[in-house]
Amino acid sequence: MVYEGDVDIVVLPGAAGEMGILPHHAPLLTTLKYGFIKVRKQNVEEIFTVAGGVAEVQPDIVTVLADAAENIEEIDVTRAEQARQRAQDVLAKGLPADTDAYLAIEAALRRSDLRLEAVRRYRKGTRSTHSGEN
């Protein structure tokens, strides 16, 4: 479990776009794309990366089942940069694009890029050596 508690608003990266969920929201079910979940309570915002999954919204609860999620404050930048480099190195060797190994490495690269983007965009006082270029 990454987060549990009462909040004022949850912003999710839904398949059809970013969506803000307030208390007493109408029920819905949505898939999640790679992106950021923002949880705000009393003007304090926590941000999490999410690498796909689903969200179920009920009037008084939001449940997220994610393939991967983490609080941006817990991201180890060095580790994310190393994972990104390893994935790029493997992909550069020319794995066939239709293999499970290729898809797994591609997903690892996307997760690393997401972590590094989260740090750049949202974490205060942290600099990454990642340039954002592929």
Annotate the PLM regions.
Residues 10, 29-32, 55, 109, ...:
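Residue-level detector of solvent-exposed, low-hydrophobicity positions
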Residues 38, 44-52, 57-90:
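Negatively charged, Asp/Glu-rich surface segments that serve as flexible interaction/assembly modules
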Residues 6, 19-22, 57, 83, ...:
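Aromatic-enriched hydrophobic runs in primary sequence
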Residues 1-47:
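A positional/architectural concept
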Residues 12-16, 24, 33-35, 49, ...:
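Generic hydrophobic/packing signal
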Residues 71-134:
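Acidic/glycine-rich phosphate/pyrophosphate-binding loops and surrounding catalytic core
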